[in-house]
């Protein structure tokens, strides 16, 4: 709901940080969003990650990817461009082999839209003691290209997409991509994905 000009989301809900490149899963928390005008916004959030994710630690099925977290984001749109800066601090991170350590991640990303075509790029920087001790990478980049998009209410709507990821373990907590991101947990992952979606019937994508 809203309290004056502030949009409030509270309880258990799904949230995505940095276009899902840092985290995309359930949280128990509160998120406040303020429209700053001129298509810009400010977001602040605090809570606990409630992902019930499968961490890379042996026998840890069902353990959440991380514990408490705080997040701040600033973004907006300028003509054909949109962009967002994120900062996330998470405690007790289990995913990506981080063994319950703390993780600090910031990102800056932008997209350019031309008709149905959308091109994006993002840079991420992480800080995690376990990854540092291992000698793993603490930075990452993501590039994306999209054409069109499916609309769950519009039968026959469709979209195509491709993304390239090069993310060190320190830059990600829980990623929703179709692929094995945990085979070499402290190394992070590198590769691309290609896909598409189409709405066959209302609410059937």
Model-derived regions, located:
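Outer membrane beta-barrel
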Residues: 1-57, 66-86, 111, 137-176
